[in-house]
Amino acid sequence: MNYLLTYALYILILSVLMGISTWKLFKKLGYSPLVAFVPFYNYFIVLKETKHPKWWVVLAYFPIVGTIMMTIFHLFLMKKFGRDSIGQKLLTIVLPFIYMAVVNYSSDVRVIKDYDEDDRKETVLGSLTYAVVFATLVHTFSFQPFGIPTGSMERTLLVGDFLFVNKLSYGYRMPMRPLALPFLQGTIWDTGEKGNPKDDPKSYVEAVKLPYWRLPGWDNVQRNDIVVFNYPDDSVHVSIDRKDSYVKRAVAVAGDVLEIKGGKLFINGKPEEVMGDAEMQQSYDVAASSPLDIPSLYKYLGFLPVVERGQNTKGEYIYYFSGLTSQLVEEIKQIPEVISVTPKIQEKGVKDVAHYLNLEASKREGIYVESKKINYSSSIFPFNKDWNKDWYGPLRIPKKGDVITLTQENLPEYRTLITKYEGNILEYKGGAVYINGEKTDKYTVKQDYYFMMGDNRDASLDSRYFGFVPETHIVGKPMFTWMSVEGLFSNDQSHYQANGKKLRFDRMFKATNTGNADKASYWWLAVILLTLFFGWEYFVKFFKKKKEED
């Protein structure tokens, strides 16, 4: 069932519930009881009778924000019939159609006098509601705030950067779980290490679901774009749009052939094009004749995740830096105590395999002990290849329309694509492949895919581990950094942390996806948004008063 038809069905159900629970109230207002059953028009009458802006009705059935607006409209209607106490408001919010039905079928219900101007004067609650609705509209339908808690894109994007993500440029993806709390991605809160993440309270209603549908955009994901997408291996959330959001660089797009040789990335047989704003990082071992003053190093070079390895047999002090740019490497080499700076490159032919933690053994031994169970989400993709993060491929990125010849050898590469991403049933039995019960050795790809990698190449969980990112999972393009706070998130891969919290003003309201080293400033946009946010009601009242005076 397509998106619009499914959504129309939900609107019809809500309209029937509205009609059943309020038709007598509409009759008391002087309208036909049938009006209560008519989508949009029923709420239009509520706004008209309660003397509120009638254009608000267009928001009644919007995904996410519609829940807020309908609740507000229900409160208006109940107030019109004298149900305005705190308890009655709570019942209207929590049990809307049940409580309104109780009022509807009560014998003593009557219409109260029209609102006085004093009754509708601005309150803290009213201002808060306006702010929530405005922010929800922006967050849901155009620019979504996104914070960076990890260092996979260092130093192109920094831990503590907060971005505005343009959800329109690649085509707006309509919400797939329209009944949800605003501003929350997947869960309301984390129940902790002992709890199963799948049992955490969700911020959305899973039962109310809509199919995938993307509106046309004005751009496609280009090679080297920085992209926000939903993490494909998120097993906690079924809905695509509720999976965790990741930000990486699209190093390869549909149809490209990717290969990594000795830590160097090649696309279609050529060395990758490094964008002007990209600061690629790799991991290094640094040997020093005496202990390094890491806190002082931070003052000159900024925060660098580092782990002390102790002394080697030569008496040298070894430090593991999980991410250094080529420029930082040269600066560290100039430190008098530094003896050598050696890149950490994995051996060719050694497969990257991750195992789950053996919790009981780790507690008993007091150290990290791996179990025998393989963590496929953090192991190399595809699992049947002897690849690792530094020696990878060649791998072709699937493109819409590609006809794949399926073999036992390449099934691990395409199984998730065929089943999870494109909704088919795949079986391998008797030496043959069956898709949806039919024997075949061919499959036609239904959508484009992308290969995402972090600029901090050795500290990034990316497509080398979770595989292709389908078009359905694309959220949008980061537009600019609206705030940046150093030290906001701790780095569990470092023995040292940033010294306190401080704003990085030089990064605020700067473009994040231009490909140029010199970032454009968006302070002008910040001024416009703040003026709209805080000044909307003021301007509305000002022009309304002027109109009345004229």
Predicted regions and their residues:
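Feature marks short, highly hydrophobic, charge-poor N-terminal signal-anchor/signal peptide-like helices
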Residues: 1-9
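N-terminal low-hydrophobic presequence detector
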Residues: 2, 18, 59-60, 252, ...
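Short, flexible segments with low predicted structural confidence
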Residues: 9-10, 17-18, 125-129
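Extended hydrophobic leader/signal-anchor segments used for secretion and membrane insertion
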Residues: 114-550
